[in-house]
Amino acid sequence: VSDPVPPDSILAFAEKLGADLWVMGKDFNFSGDKLQWSWAGRGRRYSGLAYPALRGANQLLNASGVLAALEVMRPQLPVTAQAIRNGLAMVALTGRFQIVPGEPVLVLDVAHNPHSVSALAANLDAMGFYPTTHAVFGAMADKDLAAMFQKMLPLVDQWYFADLPLPRASSAAQLVEFW
């Protein structure tokens, strides 16, 4: 679990299953400087790693969780240190703080809960000044809209609400009403 403060429900369920749950800060951790980072787990260390190719504040947490998962699966799925370095350098995830080249600057992100919206807000804020920020937004009806809007309202100048073609989705009209 790469969340530094995992939900109690995850910890309890893992204990109920008798799972060997690896937890960030207890079973593995990372550290870094401006040029590289390192990871340490129960019995293995990686030093001098290049930062993941993905942009965003949470990427070392995510990469650390991936390295922990690979370490757990090592007996069934051995992965070389070079393959890990290549993977970190070449990783891409469409729609996760994806910056589309051109003018205007276009950022695509599928942030879908308060935690991921917080990361999106931090990443947008770190990008620097842009005269205006427009957001196209759609969401499922069961999401915590108040928490998501609270994080994004200070950063967005113009909102465009979208209907999503899913039964669980809030309509654009419902989003406008909530906003």
Predicted regions mapped to residue ranges:
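Acidic, Mg2+-coordinating active-site environments of NTP-dependent enzymes
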Residues: 1-46, 63, 67-85
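C-terminal helical cap/extension that packs against the catalytic core
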Residues: 3-22, 31-34, 105-108, 114, ...
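Nucleotide phosphate-binding/pyrophosphate-handling subdomain across enzymes
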Residues: 40-158
